[in-house]
Amino acid sequence: MIKILIDCFGGDHSPEANVDGAIAALAKMPDLHLILTGDEASLQHCLQGKTYDTQRLEIVHAPEVIGCEERPIDVIRLKKESSMIKAVRMLRDCDDINAMVSTGSTGALVAAALTRIGRVKGVIRPAFCPILPTMDGGIVGICDSGANVEITPEHLRQFAIMSSLYMKHVYNIEKPRVALLNVGKEAEKGDEIRQKAHFLLSETPEIHFVGNMESRDLLSGRYDVVVCDGFSGNVLVKTTEGTALELLKKLKKDIYSRPIYKLGALLMKRMFMEEKEFMNYQNYGGSILLGTSKTVVKGHGSSKATAVEKCIEQAYRMETSSLSSKMEEIIMRYEHYEY
């Protein structure tokens, strides 16, 4: 049985979306056991009238909620009864609990995970790796996307190793193509950090490094993993998601601007619906925090039930892949760590 904690408060649609996503995940995965943390009365209210296996879902009362504007260091110290911190403590202390999912504050989650759960042996800094769809029907992982603003070339090599293993063992991509986000494709492009990182990645046989990537090629389908610092990665992901949403809005507005466009849209309704689903980030779950000793998945703050369900599925697949041991084995081959 795979046991996963769900932090049910802190997101824009909490706790309803978290509860509905949890119930949907239970229906799909018969060997899954979920533990919901949060205000018990609110969670019981959300569960009323819902059909689910009561033997595989439990509630742990946590009356406090962490706001996105609160300082991470403060909430770890002062909000020990919050849904997030209680989930992190349980993940650390209980050997039979495998993973946790949260749609709450990113800063608080990273700080709590690093100080309370710890890292895989040899990992310098854990990193987020969200998934986006590509134009050829595949997916691409972006690592890092927000955990580390300041990085070194060695950090980028570790991000590449971790995310490459993730794409291989969780998403079944046999030989993930790894690219380095840069301002140009030539090896000498970028600042000193990127130039040194390019050399390190080229000298790392455990990954299939294919060179630099410009941001415009992110969704081209030519890459399976893109490594970068957390600031650039976060901007890249959010710009891509935002552009897709705005294009859909413009398309809808244009369709309603003329009767003939409405007629054409009616004939192409099925295609438009498929494209809308393809570009909807809710269908791709959240960001796995690679490199922590236990699995942590961070969902969008705006996650609805579908996204929460996908986050749970990510955590489940991570646990069934035994990725942490594989990650430690490769990373420990390199001795020059920068702690």
Tell where the protein language model's regions lie, with residue ranges.
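N-terminal phosphate-binding or glycine-rich loops at protein starts, especially the Walker A/P-loop
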Residues: 1-44
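Short, conserved active-site loop motifs that form the nucleotide-linked donor/cofactor pocket
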Residues: 32, 56-57, 140, 207
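Phosphate/nucleotide-donor binding subsite
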Residues: 51-96
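Glycine-rich phosphate/nucleotide-binding loop
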Residues: 114-128, 134-142, 222-226, 230-339
